[in-house]
Every structure is written in structure tokens, then in C-alpha cells.
Amino acid sequence: YIIKETSISSVIKSVALKNKDDLIENDIELDVKVNDENVLTDSKWLEFMLNQIINNSIKYRNQDKKACIKITTEKIDEKVTLSIYDNGIGIKKSDLPQIFNKSYTGDNGRKVAKSTGMGLYIVKKLCEKLGHKLDVESEYGKFTKVQITFYENDFYKF
């Protein structure tokens, strides 16, 4: 891992460009409202994690309504929280405690052909290695919100 000050907005722009075709093809609105916060992380792995989360938002969108993915940041004291919210099909309450388990696909994953159950597992492991906190909140049939919290850490400042 290469931990250094990283611009969240530049990583989001890169991820948006990578997913541009899928977002357009599936008529998904991407609403980005982020302050240009710098966080201590590995930019390559942050991009990988955001890509996984956005791919899940695209994969599990609600076909019955206009899909929207909202990305925001909030800085409170010594931490920055990056939130990725979608109005997709959500995650069943019974599946939520297991979504970070290796190979766990849940009820939604069993309905989608390209689900391996590895995406959130890897994202969780990367957050642990990088010292970030990962939270997922969801209401089945309504939304999913994934939050990555970055802490200011003097350990990485040489």
C-alpha cells in the first residue's frame, strides 16, 4: 500500500469516467456533491473500492424507477466520511449482517448472474488494512448507503 494525501474528488472523477458507459447505458443519474477533501489513503485501492461500490449500485438498481447514485463527503473534526447512496433494490435486513462475508451473495446476488460475493468482502478487507471504517445502511426496496470514514492519522505523516 502507498499511503499518501489523496484528493477524494479526483478519485471519484476517475471512477465516474470508468463507469460512464454503464451509467449512460442504464440511464443512471450520478449526483456528486463532494468538498475537495484530501485524505490519507492509497489512491489506487480507494479507486478499486469505489468502483466495486458503484458497480453494485448499477447491478442492483431498481428497474421500476429512475436510478440515482449520490456521492457526498462530510468533514467532522479529524475525520472525513465519503457516502455513496443509491435508490436501488436495497439489501434485506436478514442479509445485512453477512454482506462482508467471503462469497456471500445474499438474496439479491442469487438473482443476478454476475454476483460472486467477493466485492464487499474485498472492500471491507481493504478498509481494515488502510485504517478506514466501512458502514452499510440499507432498506430493502428503497436504498443502500455505503460509507467509508477516513481518519486523520499522524502515523502516516512522516
Region locations from a protein language model:
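Conserved micro-motifs of the catalytic ATP-binding
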Residues: Y1, V34, N38-D42
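Short helix-loop "hinge" at the ATP-lid/N-box region of the Bergerat-fold HATPase_c
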Residues: S57-R61
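Glycine-rich ATP-lid/hinge loop adjacent to the conserved G-boxes
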Residues: Q63, Y104-K114
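Short beta-strand/loop element within the Bergerat-fold HATPase_c
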Residues: K66-E78
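Acidic ATP/Mg2+-coordinating residue in the GHKL
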Residues: D86
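Short conserved segment of the HATPase_c
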Residues: I91-S103
